[in-house]
Amino acid sequence: MNNFKKKPDPRHPNPHHYDLIVVGASFAGLIAARTAAHRGLRVAVIDAKSEPGARVRTTGILVKEAVEECDIPAALTRKIHGARLYAPNHKHIDLFAPGYYFLATDTPAVMRWLARETARAGADLFFGARYTGAVVIDHQVRLPDLNLTADYLLGADGAKSRVAESFGLGRNSEFLIGMETEYEETPTVDPDYLHCFLDTKLAPGYLGWVVPGAGMTQVGLAVSNGNFSAKRKPDYDAFVKNIDRHFALWNCEVKAKRSGPIPCGGVVKPLSTHRVLLTGDAAGLVSPLTAGGIRFAFRYGRRVGAVISEYLQDGGADPGLVMAREYPRFGLKTWMRRAWSAAPPNALINAALFTPPMQALAQWIYFQKRGGLVSEKPERRPHNHQNPFRAFS
């Protein structure tokens, strides 16, 4: 993309040196870079992908808490107010919470928008630039293969972080393995709901989903895989065949496919070393229970950008020490992840899902701290914004 730099600006006194280099044009990486650039740092983002939004590996579903951290253009989203939770026998419950919603997104478009915003803040973005390693010499981080140096390096390069590997930092060791297909938008999918399927034969340790997305229908599932070297993979075709009675997906045009590991073991240790810090998926900032990480990418990406700026500009506290205190612990959710990974039998799920305790638990999982069951779904209301993707708001 011609609005992103291909090489350092030769007009700068030291064009190959930056205050901060961010590895990974991820949600966390771009938010951190934008924040640091707004605060006056000279920032570079490097990413091996050819352009922002390429090879996306996330469903891009935002919980309301994530939306509150970062304003996304409405034209790139679709609002969903409820969750329909299916038992293995295909009976279901509908869940809502007053004032709560999810946003399905056109994720590649969101990434392109966020990259433009980061560049507009003053950061230099280098796509097609692969991180191969770095060393810290005399309080300076050097990336010899890219002929770049920095005062600080931030690893936001995903679940299998090369930055973590090259500096001997903590690495993710527990994963879900996810697979998703984007289909053309189909009228057989009720747009009021995230459709979530519990089935420990087809999706042991997690679930399957059908999402009325922003201009598409997203269908996927993930399975608990423990160590990434294990052989278990999602049986996507079996899952689609199982749910076809509801959505008739086999005749729909496929627009895109994606797959990859989702860290679910909590925050890694150690997070940092001298002049180097991890954030986002690289740091394990993904809920072990729900596998959601964008909320944490927004919140802590912004915080990391601020803390690094204070450290470099004002003699502030070491960013690694600050974020080790501030990153979430995920204690209860880690235990719940281990319990669900044990894959309770489908017969038990069929019996338990419709009991008040299980419905209350599902309400808490989907709608955070907003307890209580809501039997009536919110009224649809027209929205003044002309959004070509939105079925309702």
Regions found by a protein language model. Give the residues of each.
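Conserved N-terminal helical subregion
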Residues: 69, 78-166, 173-176
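C-terminal helical "tail/cap" subdomain of flavin- and related membrane-associated enzymes
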Residues: 306-393
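Central beta-strand plus flanking loop segment that forms part of the substrate or channel wall
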Residues: 60-61, 160, 165-196, 249-250, ...
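Active-site substrate-recognition segment that forms the wall
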Residues: 197-228
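Glycine-rich FAD pyrophosphate-binding loop
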Residues: 21, 25, 34-56
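N-terminal FAD cofactor-binding segment of flavoenzymes
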Residues: 52-84
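Beta1/beta-strand and adjacent pyrophosphate-binding region of the FAD-binding site
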Residues: 14-28
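FAD/FMN-dependent oxidoreductases across multiple families
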Residues: 131-133, 227-304, 313
